[in-house]
Amino acid sequence: AYQDITIPFQLSSVEFFTEVQRHLKPNGVMVVNLNMTSAENGSINEYLCDTMASVFKYTVTAPVKGNTNTEVFCTDADDWEETFLRSIGNLTDCDYADMMRTVHEKLTPYEGGACILTDDKAPVEVLGMRVLDELIGDELKYYKDELKTGGLSALLGG
C-alpha cells in the first residue's frame, strides 16, 4: 500500500477506517499488519488500535512470532470467532490450518482507549519515529551489553 517507514496519515484516521467499514460485507473483517510494534503508552500502535476500536465493534490483536509485527483484526460481526474457527476447519492445507490455529490461540481482545487519530490530527510520522527510535535503542543495548561483558572479540565473533 505504501513504501514509507510510517503509515500515511490518510490511511490511519477514524474517517479512513469508517470508509473501510462501509465497504465490508456484513460479517467482513479488516486485517491490518502493524510493523514496528511497541508496547509503550502513547505509541503509534496504541493510537492505531484505539482508532480502529473506536470504529469497529470487535478489535483483536495477535503478535507475529519472530519479528516486530502485530496483526489486528477488526469486525462488527458478533459471531466472528465462531466463523474464524469454522473457516479453519474448512481449510484443506494442513500447514495453513495449523498456522491459523496458532493465530487463533494468540488472539487478544483489544479494549479501545482515547488515543484517536483523525483526518485533522494524525501525527503518524512522529509516533512512527518514536517506535523506530525504541527499536534502535533495543538493538544498541544488545551490542553495548556484549561489548561490556565480552569485549570487542565478543562483537567480532571471536
Name each region found by the language model.
Residues 10, 14, 42, 46, ...:
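Non-membrane alpha-helical structural segments and their capping/turn regions in soluble enzymes
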Residues 12-26:
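A short glycine-rich, Lys/Arg-flanked "PGG" loop and its adjoining helix->strand segment in the class I
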Residues 1, 35, 64:
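An acidic- and aromatic-residue-enriched active-site/binding cleft used to recognize and process polar
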